[in-house]
Amino acid sequence: MADSYVPLPQSAGYAVVVGLGFVFAFGMMLTTYILRRYNKEVMTAEEFATAGRSVKTGLIAACIVSSWTWSATLNGSTSQVYNNGVCGSIFYAMGATVQITLFACLAIKARERAPAAHTYLEIVKGRYGTTTHFVYIFWGIVTNILVTSMLLSGGSATVNDLTGMNIVAAILLLPLGVVIYTLFGGIKATFLTDYAHTVVLIVIIFIFAFTTWATSSKLGSPQAVWEIVTKLAESNPREGNAGGSYFTMHSRSGGMFFVINIIGNFGTVFLDNGYFNKAFAANPSSTYKGYIFGSLAWCAIPALCSLTMGFAALALEHTEYWPLGRPMTAAEVASGLVLPNAASALLGKAGAVLALLMVFMAVTSAMSAELIAVSTIATYDIYRTYINPNASGKKLIWVSHLSTVIFAYTMAGFAIGLYYAKVSMGYLYEMMGVIIGGAVLSSALTILSKRQNWHAATFSPIISTALAIMAWLVCTKKKFGSVTYLKTFEDDAMLTGNCVALLTPFIIVPILTFIFKPQNFDWKLLDQRITRVDEEEELAEALGGTVSSDPERLHPIKSQISVIASQLVEGEREQYQKEKEILNKSFKICCIVCCTLAICLVVLFPMPLYGTKYIFSKKFFTGWVVVFIIWLFYSAFQVIIFPIWESRTDLYHTFRGIYWDLTGQTYKLKAWQNEHPEEMHAVRSQLQAQLSRTAVTHEIVDGKAFGDGYVTPANIDDALEEKKG
């Protein structure tokens, strides 16, 4: 498209990237004002990072769908179908669903064992001390760098392809609106814009699906697509596929990608602080449900999108409708340009606009989650831990804002460098498992197992990553003769590096744990070592007052919100204890459900079709398409309708308050808020904070926590220094 046909003018690119970005930014500013006025949401440091720790299941699921839908999700999965046929959609979708499903187990334990945490790295610090903390900060930041690089690389390439907009300009402008609304609304802004983006995304996929499979005069049915692509395979069979067909799950290249996809995405989920941010922001009872429902809802998005657009590209590439007028090059496919070309071929300029909107939504929603992930690491794991442990909430908010801006435009510069170096989105996607996969097991065991010791947690990621990079490069040299960009991108080399990265820790962790003896960590210590930020100053200022000290009583005067919360604590204590018990009991159920789903997604569903080398008949392919269209309807219910239903009471209160203001009945709003303080978000947030604090004070004695007879020192760094001495 870039060298022969650009369906949209450059102005369309700027209108979407800049104009739509500012629309979302303005909308978030307005939403922040509405939430503050009608729900009493105060943007404290805690609120910025955790949204009051009360987000419900439906919205968590919607956020999971949005955050996990990258430009690589849409463009990369479509390229897989274009390259390998029908297996590409399943191997991409199910190979990247299993990680979110299994992460639910990790989320529920992190929420239970560190209820005051803002990042998973705080758990690492609380358990293993400074050295290990820095190791995982490195891997966490590298994960965010790789993900954000893919977002900007894939998104800018698509914008350029559809509009001719300069790629460097696109890279610099894509983060602008995201930064603005993230600064104003924090993680709550991310959640709400995630919801809006997901609605638009699903609607656009439905439009493409019904056009391709039902209404288009160019295609119009699964049967027509099957016939066209079957003829294509007769003249140009797909090497490595059973019978050379595009309608088989048995594909050598597809199978390799399946393994690479599974391994690489374990790192981008288990090491991305953004997914832990959502776990810590969730209502305790919603934590694992949001991840399970969200993973199932997400699976249909890349599956149906890639199935639709990949086969549309295969069917239309050799017709007069194809905008390029020639087949795509391997570089264009690797850059993720199959989807925008297919959209233009299918619906002309309307299709190009829809593809542009879809990719813009995917890039900006996922990037906002990455910005929050990095800002919380910078704020709580670096600034609050090592620079200013007594920082006020206002200072932490300032650090969060600064780190958001710095990371966004550092990554823009890095993405520009990748563009000039001609490193594609597809290359980054397959390489990320080699770089970050070595830290997956040890980071998970830090939360799940009290036996993993300091040596295993600290050295396993370093050793595994070094071996993975070595294996990747050695395989490239031995199998392909030289180490170049294109040679390291070969399936065999990428597969080798990814497998070594993920699987080596399964050997190293047990060996180091056996040699240096297992730890017996007392989880109760995390309650002492990881604390919430004191919000009194911010809350008092939000109400128009200040916080001062009462020298006679020797404790700070509380804000009005905290006073009200204190009055409600006793009445809520029993329910709080029940929620903690439910969280504990839910873990076993969660593990059974998640493991069952994972086996179904990775083994039971795709493997029989792979092993039998079955080639889809026309009827079977039609049924296959129908199943995924129905699945997307479930996704629409789960992430569009269900969040509204769950929040119906809050929405009613908000719109009623707006009505009272617009009709000159503001006195009713103030009277209702005074009579029902328990309904106010800020009060509920403080209530949870006070319940959390009072629940653990009796478990800490002289700086030590007592559990099952084993006592872990309160300061792990001091203990390690003593041991070394």
Swiss-Prot record:
One of its GO terms (cellular component) is plasma membrane. The keyword Glycoprotein applies. It is a multi-pass membrane protein. It is found in: Membrane. It catalyses: spermidine(in) = spermidine(out). One of its GO terms (molecular function) is urea transmembrane transporter activity. Pfam families: SSF (PF00474). Its main location: membrane. Belongs to the sodium:solute symporter (SSF) (TC 2.A.21) family. Major spermidine uptake transporter that is also used by salivary gland-secreted histatin 5 (Hst 5) to enter into candidal cells. A major component of host nonimmune defense systems is salivary histatins, a family of small (3-4 kDa), histidine-rich, cationic proteins secreted by major salivary glands in humans and higher primates. Hst 5 is the most potent of the 12 histatin family members and has fungicidal activity against blastoconidial and filamentous forms of Candida albicans. Hst 5 cojugates to spermidine to be uptaken by DUR3. This is Spermidine transporter DUR3. It comes from Candida albicans (strain SC5314 / ATCC MYA-2876). The gene is DUR3.
